[in-house]
Amino acid sequence: MAPVATATPFLPTISNETTLRQTFVRDEDERPKVAYNVFSSEIPVISLEGIDEVDGRRAEICKKIVAACEDWGVFQVVDHGVDAGLISDMTRLAREFFALPPEDKLRFDMTGGKKGGFIVSSHLQGEAVQDWREIVTYFSYPIRARDYSRWPDKPEDWRSVTKTYSEKLMELACKLLGILSEAMGLDTEALTKACVDMDQKVVVNFYPKCPQPDLTLGLKRHTDPGTITLLLQDQVGGLQATKDGGKTWITVQPVEGAFVVNLGDHGHFLSNGRFKNADHQAVVNSNTSRLSIATFQNPAPDAIVYPLAIREGEKPVLDEPITFAEMYRRKMSRDLELANLKKLAKTENQQVAEKAEVEAVVQPKGLSEILA
């Protein structure tokens, strides 16, 4: 018997369709409110030049980072010490990967619970609507947990460059966590130590041109669960953030060679809510593709989540210490519950509307209308 052919999944990168598939269409309240290229200057750009010097420079940098974390929980860093050539190589190789034929990318398909590889049109737990993107991801720390069989072997040099990139981003993340630890009145290593054995996951996002970008998202609104995230993005634009519950959104201005830094839920809890964990999302456009590389720094699953410093007059934002694994499980449960509640409300509203339409059609005429 001949083997059954497996259908190639829909890949946005090779789509020539002019109408968005229904599986990507978002409810109206989730659709973009601000264009991908209407940029805001609200997110500060902070130079890290002199961060290792024990003088006024470090104190000034610390002050700026803390202010940004207390306001938005998002800022950009330049003069960060990550080589421009490495950044260029990483972005070039990422684009080359997504330009590969489908069969080359799908060799690293993550379906079936595989850890690391290629994902097509992901969606958050409990949702049917898909994000307009393709992803390749790999787990780089702890080093002993690396599974190079899940790291793509194309294009050439991918593994060597991504390995170096991961190491440099780990160094930068620890440096930033040191600043925040000091701001909380703790030892420089406090936040890093709270992660126990820091986990690092790199997610390379490719957002292809979209036929109807006003109907969908590249990545739905969310907060990151981990400690801190460093995002490298190209100059297209599409990263958006909100700090008022989604009433207003801003598009982060791309800065050449900069990393966008945002605090995750774990970092928010460790600071007892002092440092914000901003909701953010990615929008797409019909003119050009967009690339971003997110490096997530997360605590070990068994790391304890509880405020490290509670200021006078404050109450802990958590009732009790829990593990990061439990914190993440609760987050996923809440997300699933909210998705189900929204789905139920949508169904009920549709039923009410349909009933109203039927009643409007069969409504008998009043006596005055008959005798008129």
Swiss-Prot record:
Task: Please give the pathway this protein is involved in.
Answer: Flavonoid metabolism
Binding-site residues for Fe cation, renumbered to this chain:
222, 224, 280
One term of GO molecular function: metal ion binding
Which keywords does UniProt give here? Dioxygenase, Flavonoid biosynthesis, Iron, Metal-binding, Oxidoreductase, Vitamin C
Q: How is the cofactor bound?
A: Binds 1 ascorbate molecule per subunit.
Instruction: Name the source's superkingdom.
Output: Eukaryota
Top EC group: oxidoreductase
Listed binding positions for 2-oxoglutarate are 290
Report the PROSITE patterns cross-referenced here.
FE2OG_OXY
Q: Which PANTHER family match?
A: OXOGLUTARATE/IRON-DEPENDENT DIOXYGENASE
Report the function annotation for this chain: Catalyzes the 3-beta-hydroxylation of (2S)-flavanones to 2R,3R-dihydroflavonols, which are intermediates in the biosynthesis of flavonols, anthocyanidins, catechins and proanthocyanidins in plants. Can act on naringenin to produce dihydrokaempferol, and on eriodictyol to produced dihydroquercetin.
The entry's protein name is Flavanone 3-dioxygenase F3H2
Instruction: Tell me which species this is from.
Output: Crocosmia x crocosmiiflora
Q: Which gene encodes it?
A: F3H-2
